Each structure stands twice: as structure tokens, then as C-alpha cells.
Amino acid sequence: MAPTQPQTKVRKPPRSWDALTPPLAQWILDYLSSMGFTQPTPVQKSCLELFRGNKDVVVEAVTGSGKTLAFLIPVVEKLLRGEEPAKRNHVQGIIISPTRELATQIYNVLVSLVKFHEPSAEAISHAKSDEKRPTATQPVVVPQLLVGGTTKAAEDLGTFLRLSPNLLIGTPGRLAELLSSAYVKAPASTFEVLIMDEADRLLDMGFANELNRILGYLPKQRRTGLFSASLSDAVERLITVGLLYPHKITVRVKSLKDGGIIQERKTPMSLQMSYLVTPASQKMPAIVQLLEKLEPRPQRSIIFFSSCMAVKYFSRILGAVLPAGFSVTSLHGKLEPKVREKNYERFVNTTSPMVLLTTDLAARGLDIPQVDLVIQHDPPTDTKVFIHRCGRAGRAGRRGLAVVLLQPGREEGYVQLLEVRQTPITPLEKPAISVTPDEVERVSAAFRSQALADREIFQMAQLAFVSWTRSYIEHQASSIFRIADLDWLDLAKGYGLLELPKMPEVREAKIDRSLGLGINTEEIPFKDKVREKKRQEELAKWKEEKAKRAQEENTGDKRKKNEAWSGKAEQEETKLQRREKKRRKREAKKFSEMTEKEKEEHLKLEQMIEEVRKRNEAKAAEERAAALAANPPKPKAPVKKVDDSDEEFGGFDD
């Protein structure tokens, strides 16, 4: 009989999913395989080892490191490990997110995961039914999404009672509101786990009160996971209140700097972060070249702007100059929730090259797959946001490029500032970008022609430029981003302006607001015939009132020649009051005839201009006070008072 050969034990790769202890369920491995995730990221490996072992965790990891699965897998395992299903209307887990987009994204990832767990997939299939979900015979994961803008609070409660979910995912306000209902129960005997995702942003957005309310509804004996890209003092205080003896997980990426020095990076190695120095008028032509020349051609690109109005404006006009095959969509905080959701889904699911124009709304948390290119048209006012903007590309090991556009001069100092903050960026070398004067004129002319054809676009351009100026003034790195160093004419060309807005900065610079174009902007019509008809009627009234005022003033001038000096000051004051009253009346009437959108934009513009005016007045007052302190006026010589009390007139002599 041949001797039995000893069996060779197959060793599993140390970084594979199979190597985790305890091992993952087979259905979870099937999901990971179907998604192409061959091995866990460092944050996933560290988190799964601790969080699955009944320990609270605080996870600080770079953007795009795979935090979502790092907490979803342990949460699902905790909810399924019981012997019996959760009682009806009893919540076992909660995931808090700062924005509806991020909450929706987490919900969708969770649904795609638990579809591989047959009992949970069967339970979730009843989500769209009007009848109550049948009671499960074994533990399942049934999530409910709670975000504002799509449903009302009463509808959320109705869905909860019908579906009986055991895992809630949503924004702080909606979660706190649902938990306040007597029908929603989260006792210590049932509740398992709380997740706070993007915790620093939750606090930055002012959700501290809602978080405290939520914590008040939950038992202290629970597992808690706090996930964030950075840990601020406010987050540390939240950790003290919300977690018991947490284990801190910090995942850094290290790269070799010139000279062989190892330095920490706050972004994945797969992400290249670069800068391009270019005048304002060349920014858009440079973006067009970047999209044309980048190999392979970017499928999904994101361009960040400093304001909602800039996103709104450029999303209307940029399509005219983009390379063939590219489309444009937008995402910002002023959009209706349903429009935001539609645009987000359109960008995520696009099958052709698309450019998303957005504000810092999309800078954090949104895990948009396969973003190839991020361009920062405007550097963020808060340098901490820079890294999160860049992190939209190069996620989950995919190669990505992030480029920030800087104007020549002081703005180039932004590179050194980022290096000090452990966010080094390098000059963009590939693809080589070289913009000619002809390209600048072509792009600017394309923008201006659209503004000439539609007054709505002309007005958008004015509002966008004012809001950009406001954000530039408020930049934290004010020594680098100085309003006094700006080339207003070059900026106007970059925005495709037909005239500069009425702003104190433009007035102080003593620039011709017409830009030498010789365009009468009052004659630019609305494409919408109804709006144009209304505008013409208002314009006719205004001209009539102006002529009437001029006639009244002319008549008044003639009367002045024959008037006595006495009483003129009082008459002038009365006239000014009457004139101001008429002006306010006209403004009120004009405002009342505006659409809600026009009213909102008008108020924004007035508020912006007023804030800028106040700041400039305050600055001027400080400068006058400083000048007065440096050169105080000489004191005047005292006037000697003559005492003539003894020389009182006593009458004439006889």
C-alpha cells in the first residue's frame, strides 16, 4: 500500500477578502467578486477586523479609500447574526449622512449588497407595495431612506409602519423627526449599531442639535462607528459624547518626496494632483484643450466653481465650446431636490463623455464612480475643501487627474500653501496646454453671442460675476487672493461679459464698464416672448416717469429764480422725501411683477452689492481713522472771551 501523501495547505493571500478573520459570509464574497473588488483597501481591512469584533471605531481615512463598504459590511453582519428577526417597528441600526445625495448613494450600495442575501432581497421587494410587509421568519436587512425634498415626514412614517425597516439611512433632520414618533422603537434589547458618516461635515453644516436629539433616542449600549476624512476639535467632542472606548483607525498614504524624504499624503496614490497657471480669460479655452487632449478621453469630468450662480451660468453656455461628444449637467444647492437627484443619476449612469459643473456640494462624500478628471476653475475659499474636491477622482484605486487653475502672480503662492498643509501639487505637464489669443477670442465671442441673444443669460452673467467677486473677497488666504491684484478686463473676457456689473471694486478701479464693446445692454431682449413683452411695458413706464421727473425738475428750476431764500431748505427736503417715496413705490411695483425666480435673483444681487458696499465703507473708515491717527490736526489757539458785562448800555445823556 502506497504511503499517504501529506496534504499541502493552500495559504490564502494575506490581503484577500478570504483572509479576513472571522471569514465573510459566502454571499458577501459573491457580491464583492461581482463588483470586481479583489481585495480590501487598508481602511476596509482595519475597520472590518475591529468593528466586526464589537468595538467602537473612529476612522480617519483619505478621500476615496472605500469607507462606505468598511461600515456597511459590519452593519449588515450585526443585523443578521441574531436567531430571530427584529420585532415589528423596532430599529436595529441607523446610518447618518450630511446630504441627501450621499444618503441616497449609501442606500443604493446597501440595496445592491443585500440583494445577494435571498431573505433580505425578498423582504426588500415589498418596498413598493401598498400592503404591509409580511413578517420574516429569519433575520433580514430591510433599509429605509429618509431624506428631505422627495417625501414629507408623514409619508416617511407611513412607509415605516408599512415596511417595518430595521435599518434607517438618512439626513439628521429627517432621522430625528422619525425617531420622535411613538411608533418608532429603538430599545437597548434591539438596537445594534449607529454610523455617523462624514462626521466633520455633519458638524460643519450645523447638525449638532439634530445629532444630540438622535443620540438621546438611542440606548447607550450599542456599537458606534464614526467615519471622517479629518478629525476636528468638534468631532473629538462628538466622539467623547457618542462613543465608548473607541479604537482609532488612521489610514495615510505615503509618497517619496524629492531628496528621499517620505511624506504623508491625504489623497490616494492613484490620483495625480496638478496646477496650471493661466490668465482668467484663458481658463475656459484651457479646459476645452484638457478635455480634447487627455488620453484616454475622460468619460466623467467635474468642474468646480465658487458659487451656485456661476454653475447656473456656465451650465447654460459651456456646451457651445466643448469638444464634440461632450454633454453638460449641473449640481448645486439651489436646484430643486428632484432636479438635483435627476442630474446626479444622469451623471452617474452616463454612457458618453459628460461634464458635471458643481459647487462644493459635490466635494465631499459622493462616491461617483469612474471620475477621470477634476478641474477647479476657482480655488476653494477654504483650503481644507481643496483635498476633498480633488478626491472625487482616483477613487478605489482608479487613476485620476485633478487640476486647479491659478492666475499668474500672487495666486501662484497657493502651491506653497498647499505644500505646507501636506497637499503637494505639481505643474501640469501632460497633456501640454497652450492657449492662443485666437482661441480666447473664439470662446469669449461664443459666450457673448449667447448673452446678446437672450437677456436671461446676460443677467445670469452679471449675477455670476458679482457672486464670484464676493467669494474671492472672502477667501481665507487673503494675502494670496487679493482683489486689488485682479485684471478686471481679462476676467470680463473670461466670463463673456457684455459689460461689467455696477460694483464698488469696478468703480474704484476706474474701468470703463462697457468694456469698449459699444453695446447698449438695455436693448438685449428675452428669448421668452412673454417676459420680453413685460419688460418692454416696464421700460416704457420707466421712460415716461423719467421724462415727467425731468419736466418737473425743469419747472422747479424756473420757479427758483423768483423764490425767496427763506423756506428753500425745507422745500428741498420735502422734494427729496417725495422723490425717494416715488422711487420706493416704483421699485416695489417692479418687484411685485417679477417671477419668484426673478425676485430671488434680484434680492441676491441687491444683498451682494450691499454687503460689498458696506465692507468697502468700513474699510475706507478704517483707513481715514488710521490716517487721522498718523497725522492728528494741530490744536487751535484758545479764543479769549471779553467780559463786557460792565459796559451795559444805560441810555442817552440829556
From Swiss-Prot:
Residues 578-588 have a biased composition (Basic residues). GO terms for cellular component: 90S preribosome; nucleolus; nucleoplasm; preribosome, large subunit precursor. It comes from Neurospora crassa (strain ATCC 24698 / 74-OR23-1A / CBS 708.71 / DSM 1257 / FGSC 987). This is ATP-dependent rRNA helicase spb-4. The lineage of its organism: Eukaryota, Fungi, Dikarya, Ascomycota, Pezizomycotina. Residues 48-249 form the Helicase ATP-binding domain. One of its GO terms (molecular function) is RNA helicase activity. Residues 286-444 form the Helicase C-terminal domain. The gene is spb-4. Residues 531-631 form a coiled coil. The Q motif is unique to and characteristic of the DEAD box family of RNA helicases and controls ATP binding and hydrolysis.
